[in-house]
Amino acid sequence: MKSPVELNQYFKYWEITKDLIDQCIDIMLNLRQSGHPGGSRSKVHGMLTTLLSGAMRWDIREPGKRFADRFVLVAGHDNPMVYSTLAVLNEALRIKYNQTGEKRYLNYKGQEHQLVWEDLLTLRRKGGLPGHAEMAGKTLFFKFNTGPSGHGSPPAAGEALALKLAGVGDVKVFAFEGEGGLTTGATHETLNSAWGLGLDNLVYYVDWNDYGIDSRPFSSIVHGSPDDLFTQKGWHVEGCDNNEDWKKFTQAYYDLLVTNHQKLVPKMIYAKSRKGRGYYVYDEKSHGVPHKRNSELFWKTKLDFTDKYSVQFHDFGAPEAESWGDQVKQAIFYFT
């Protein structure tokens, strides 16, 4: 992994990429009127820091690469964040290929395995992108099929153990989850097993936003905090109090994987966030309910983007179209 000093020059580009991903999440869910905006938005900084800092070794052109690190979305219902991230990064590759004609920008398995923004129009529709994480087709980036909170914890540890037993313990498994998923029994068993098995190639990222689907914050009903839990289980823990601070976030990752690296000890990094960041509906209210299609709140999230980058959305402020076909056309205009 590169040091925060080396990465500092890229933070301005990460910020732009983050904003593009946010827009993709919003437009995709605005069209489909289904999905999870709050946890998706709150994890974008963590996703980009993991993928672009060198913390995770991966190749977007070859998601099945044998010795690349693995990614498990523990709670698979936050996959709009992953879909949007892949769409933005793949669009950058598509632009570079169109500019240069160089094949190094192409997916090694062909376009049918490259998730692009057009695929976001198919969320939760037959033959389109599934509502939960599935390791197939254009979403081979996922390394396990997951759905509810905590679901991916045991598989993530199992993959880390398998890699160790195969003699490639330097291949890491990154597991993404919000702290709500830490309440499941399977997660507690995973934390115990990972420590006992010395899975230092398992890296848990916890999006610490204090809310799930209920109105009560987790801190009011669960004793202790995420860092308390992992520390008590013997894990090496690093974190930052503001996931929007790229410098502090990358420093925490660098301390975890490089400066303070511990052998045979599983790792956890946390970043405090706001569920629904930038969505104008926060905490539990943002969990699984997108804004009404083309509502005032939806357009408010677009206004932030237009003001920041001096761009305009086609028919800004327009109401939703009457037919599904015309609604899809509207979404295409918003993406382009």
Regions found by a protein language model. Give the residues of each.
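Extended, solvent-exposed polar beta/coil surface segments
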Residues: 4, 20-21, 154
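Non-catalytic terminal/interface segments that mediate subunit docking, oligomerization
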Residues: 15-18, 336
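Cofactor-binding active-site loop characterized by glycine-rich and histidine/acidic residues
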Residues: 14, 25, 31, 42-197
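Gly/serine-rich nucleotide phosphate-binding loop at the start of the catalytic core
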Residues: 37, 41
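N-terminal capping segment at the start of a domain
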Residues: 18-34, 207
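Non-catalytic, mobile gating and regulatory segments of ester bond hydrolases
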Residues: 1-15
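Glycine-rich ThDP/TPP pyrophosphate-binding loop and its adjacent helix/strand module
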Residues: 137-331, 335
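Conserved, well-structured beta-alpha core segment at the onset of a catalytic domain
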Residues: 26, 32-36, 54, 61, ...
